[in-house]
Amino acid sequence: MKEKDKPIGIFDSGVGGLTVVKEVIRHLPNESIIYLGDTARVPYGIKSPETVIKYSRQNTNFLKERGIKLLVAACNTSSAVSLSILREETDISVIGVIEPGARAAVRNTKTGNIGVIGTEATIKSGAYEKAINQWSVVSGQWSGKKIEVASKACPMFVPLAEEGWFENEVAEMTAEVYLSDFRGKRIDVLVLGCTHYPLLKKTIQKSVGTGVILIDSAEETAKEIEILLRERGLLSDGKSRFVDFYVTDNPERFSKVGKAFLGENGLSRLSAVDLSNY
């Protein structure tokens, strides 16, 4: 198989990474994709850094064995904790979801007040604050000015997304508890720092108000994938395109939630896999 026709490998702790898959399909409809959702061990956000690194390595080994041309860590927790390690240990390009989201936040803020929500591990790592502040200097947009980043861990959003509870009363009440603090901070941009969170986008937007721009790291990541593949001459012509999905537990539940935003036939090629030997 030609290098450009090899699939893109994408992994996440569960269904959240399907938000990245959806955006990759929208931006790059000719590309083949292999997706791995580690549903047996979701969520990653409450695990220790050592455990997240172990899981991320196993996910990477599984996808590399299937001949991918690019690896996407479509999990903010994995991106925050293990991305640099995966890049050191892997001989193919590795893209995370934090850097694209941080760059988009800096581009879109007018006040310099940016909010970030994510899992406990992502927020504790400070990865978004670091990336936002670095990019604000590199871009020159906020040179000499200080960007204020307000962060909040929202761990219950992940199980809500995994259950498919995107817009019901429970989701709205949970969002209100988590996000009410942002109203006094006068943010004009809120980064959805977990790939599960775009599934709750309408509920989150309702809570923070229409005056706050929501940054979807999934969409920004898909744009960066397109740029990288184009620069390296690795865009596929789509002649042998396929999209395969693997999960580590409960494929029926994964399929039910996944179909809610990928469509009825979006997960037709779905299999269960054991990662213990990876």
Predicted feature descriptions by range:
Residues 1-278:
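Non-catalytic structural scaffold of enzyme domains
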